[in-house]
């Protein structure tokens, strides 16, 4: 196993492997907020996110949605197909919350009849600004056809995830996706899907079961991530 680091982000490290086109992802215990301004470490967080992402990506594969995920290889690591990440954060919103509620002057918790799909330019120095299709084309981030593919994939993923989280008695408020191009130019779902990248509320109590407990100092991060993993395991069995 090689330890040549390819990339290090806020929550993960990517390493080369002996197999061409395959990378090893190591999940970190770090949690960040405010685009990295606030940072803390939580023992076991990397393991939780690796397990949650592995289960969710496997579930999506069973539903016919392809991703870069190959398999988990340890408590904190997984193998993935190497892709060139498209610098877009694709946010799917089912319920008013967070920045969207502030931007539109709406109350948190208001249901959105048809899910909203948004694009944000992935650039920490610019604080990941909200952009539209014309910006994407101007920046040469993706073509019109690729944006259509990404939007369609995001809506398909949303449908599958809503059904999954409903079984877990959790409301999928919103979530962030990233996509990449493989060696053949095919667009694949990439990155992770975990409480780091989703807003999740308990259906009965509206308890927040995601990174908002860290952002807002309203709970124990590892406790709520463990709760999500336990519910996920229950519906997967």
Curated annotation (Swiss-Prot):
Keywords: ATP-binding, Ligase, Nucleotide-binding, Purine biosynthesis. Pathway: Purine metabolism; IMP biosynthesis via de novo pathway; 5-amino-1-(5-phospho-D-ribosyl)imidazole-4-carboxamide from 5-amino-1-(5-phospho-D-ribosyl)imidazole-4-carboxylate: step 1/2. InterPro entries: SAICAR_synt/ADE2_N, SAICAR_synt_PurC, SAICAR_synth, SAICAR_synthetase, SAICAR_synthetase_CS. Pfam families: SAICAR_synt. Gene3D superfamilies: ATP-grasp fold, B domain, Phosphorylase Kinase, domain 1. Belongs to the SAICAR synthetase family. This is Phosphoribosylaminoimidazole-succinocarboxamide synthase. It comes from Listeria monocytogenes serovar 1/2a (strain ATCC BAA-679 / EGD-e).
């Amino acid at each position: 196993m090689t330890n040549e680091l390819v990339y290090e982000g806020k929550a993960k490290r990517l390493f080369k492997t002996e197999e061409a086109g395959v990378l090893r992802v190591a999940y970190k215990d770090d949690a960040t907020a405010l685009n990295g301004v606030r940072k803390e470490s939580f023992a076991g967080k990397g393991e939780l996110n690796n397990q949650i992402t592995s289960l969710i990506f496997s579930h999506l594969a069973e539903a016919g949605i392809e991703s870069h995920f190959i398999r988990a290889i340890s408590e904190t690591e997984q193998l993935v197909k190497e892709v060139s990440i498209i610098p877009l954060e694709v946010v799917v919103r089912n319920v008013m919350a967070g920045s969207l509620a502030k931007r539109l002057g709406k109350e948190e918790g208001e249901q959105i009849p048809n899910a909203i799909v948004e694009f944000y330019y992935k650039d920490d120095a610019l604080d990941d600004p909200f952009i539209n299709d014309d910006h994407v084309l101007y920046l040469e981030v993706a073509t019109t056809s690729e944006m259509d593919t990404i939007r369609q994939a995001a809506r398909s993923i949303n449908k599958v995830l809503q059904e999954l989280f409903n079984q877990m008695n959790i409301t999928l408020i919103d979530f962030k996706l990233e996509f990449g191009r493989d060696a053949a130019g095919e667009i694949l779902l990439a990155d992770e899907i975990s409480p780091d990248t989703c807003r999740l509320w308990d259906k009965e109590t509206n308890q927040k079961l995601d990174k908002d407990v860290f952002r807002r100092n309203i709970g124990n991060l590892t406790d709520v991530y463990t709760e999500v993993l336990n519910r996920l395991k229950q519906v997967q069995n």
